């Protein structure tokens, strides 16, 4: 009798488990996994402060990341133990957006700001008139920063800070270098080839700045773009490039007004314009000032640029030849949310908008775009998760692709290249 009762109980428990199906990627599932951001109940970064918005591979073999939310936190992933270790709360900051850079001596520089992933509150009632919506939208965007002193640049030394244990609420061991652009967030950072100068762009005013690392001093270099455009898909966002890249000659590149690539030339102290226009939608038939911006941008050793756009395209550019080539887009939806250059010659990307599930893709010129699918991990009965939103990627020393989830209670995902997309692309075990 007891045996029958046990069997019946097991059947009741097993039935819903068998009915639930996790969505797996379009490759062998053991190539995808995730880790918590610390030890639950002890060091784990709080759920409302966990969305990952910056990742950076370090020369020490580890990968550093930062979060955005009620408070901003620093963390490190160590491949030797395959774990994430929180490194403390970054002062009183709310966010870090694409602004982690390794400098001289392995010091990590961190650009901070307000949360740039939260939904902005818009004015419901507004006066009528020419371009009234655009005018009010800019007022609403600026209102968020009206009482904000400005994002800081901090320095963190892994040699001094990595060995400590940071319980929940502990402060990160960072040194404050100051505020580069008052009333603005630091929106992106890069570093010069000689590793002596940081360059950054601010949001929402799109002002370029530099930081002399040795002198710990900032210079405001001027507006990167003058035009106010709201290309979307987020309709509460001013189109400001989310990445900068330094080529070997020291020039700083990104997209500017009207989607044209431009550079800051430090040797001359001036901006250089080009005719290289990034791919995307330009709304030529409408009385609307809209153009795409760079999402991610990487400079190769030969000076070639490879980047992505807010409309979801991948492109390469040869600045010395004033030549840009579009490689299309892997997904109908707009935005490349994150990207990183893999050790296998591929550009790995996360594509998708905020109201849908992001997917992992890769691009290489000899094979085009490959669809690796949704980032779903099923290790049931131990743990499982289908993640929707991502905003940061990095490539570890061994080639592992680290992907930062940017939802509440976020996890750090890891994808191990080397496998193949399944025949027919779609994983046949997924529900359809």
Where are each of the predicted segments found?
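Surface-exposed loop and turn segments in beta-propeller and other repeat-based domains
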Residues: 29-45, 88-92, 164-181, 221-236, ...
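Short, conserved, GDST-rich strand-edge loop motifs in beta-rich repeat architectures
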Residues: 113-148, 352
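Short loop/turn segments immediately following the C-termini of beta-strands
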Residues: 68-69, 113-115, 203, 257, ...
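Conserved beta-propeller blade signature
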Residues: 62-65, 108-109, 197-200, 251-254, ...
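Repeated scaffold domains used in trafficking and secretory/extracellular systems
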Residues: 50-54, 94-101, 184-189, 231-233, ...
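Structural motif
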Residues: 71-75, 118-124, 148-152, 206-210, ...
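Residue-level detector of Asp-centered blade-edge/turn motifs that repeat once per structural unit
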Residues: 57-60, 102-105, 191-195, 246-249, ...
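Beta-strand-rich domains and repeat architectures in extracellular enzymes and scaffolds
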Residues: 41-72
């Amino acid at each position: 009798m007891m045996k029958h009762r046990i069997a019946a109980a097991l059947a009741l428990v097993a039935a819903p488990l068998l009915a639930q199906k996790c969505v797996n990627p379009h490759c062998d599932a053991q190539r995808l996994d995730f880790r918590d951001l610390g030890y639950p109940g002890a060091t784990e970064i709080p759920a409302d402060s966990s969305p990952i918005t910056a990742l950076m591979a370090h020369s020490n073999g580890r990968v550093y990341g930062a979060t955005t939310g009620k408070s901003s936190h620093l963390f490190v992933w160590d491949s030797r133990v395959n774990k994430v270790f929180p490194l403390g709360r970054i002062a009183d900051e709310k966010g870090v957006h694409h602004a982690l850079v390794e400098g001289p001596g392995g010091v990590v520089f961190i650009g901070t700001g307000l949360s740039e992933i939260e939904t902005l509150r818009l004015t419901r009632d507004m006066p009528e008139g020419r371009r009234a919506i655009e005018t009010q939208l800019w007022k609403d965007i600026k209102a968020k920063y009206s009482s904000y002193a400005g994002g800081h640049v901090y320095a963190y030394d892994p040699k001094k800070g990595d060995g400590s244990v940071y319980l929940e609420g502990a402060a990160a061991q960072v040194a404050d270098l100051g505020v580069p652009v008052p009333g603005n967030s630091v929106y992106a950072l890069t570093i010069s080839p000689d590793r002596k100068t940081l360059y950054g762009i601010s949001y929402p005013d799109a002002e370029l700045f530099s930081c002399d690392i040795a002198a710990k001093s900032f210079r405001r270099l001027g507006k990167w773009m003058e035009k106010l455009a709201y290309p979307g898909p987020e309709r509460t966002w001013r189109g400001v490039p989310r990445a900068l890249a330094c080529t070997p000659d020291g020039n700083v590149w990104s997209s500017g007004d009207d989607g044209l690539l431009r550079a800051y030339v430090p040797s001359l102290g001036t901006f250089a314009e080009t005719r290289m226009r990034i791919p995307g939608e330009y709304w030529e038939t409408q009385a609307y000032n809209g153009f795409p911006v760079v999402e991610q941008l990487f400079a190769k050793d030969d000076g070639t640029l490879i980047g992505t756009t807010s409309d979801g395209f991948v492109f390469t550019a040869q600045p010395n030849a004033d030549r840009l080539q579009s490689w299309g887009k892997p997904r109908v939806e707009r935005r490349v949310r994150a990207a990183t250059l893999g050790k296998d010659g591929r550009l790995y990307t996360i594509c998708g908008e905020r109201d849908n599930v992001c997917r992992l893709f890769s691009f290489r010129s000899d094979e085009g775009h490959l669809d690796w699918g949704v980032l779903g991990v099923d290790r049931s009965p131990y743990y499982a998760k289908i993640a929707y939103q991502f905003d940061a990627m990095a490539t570890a020393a061994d080639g592992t692709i680290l992907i930062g989830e940017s939802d509440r209670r976020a996890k750090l995902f890891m994808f191990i290249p080397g496998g193949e997309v399944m025949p027919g692309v779609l994983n046949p075990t997924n529900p359809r």
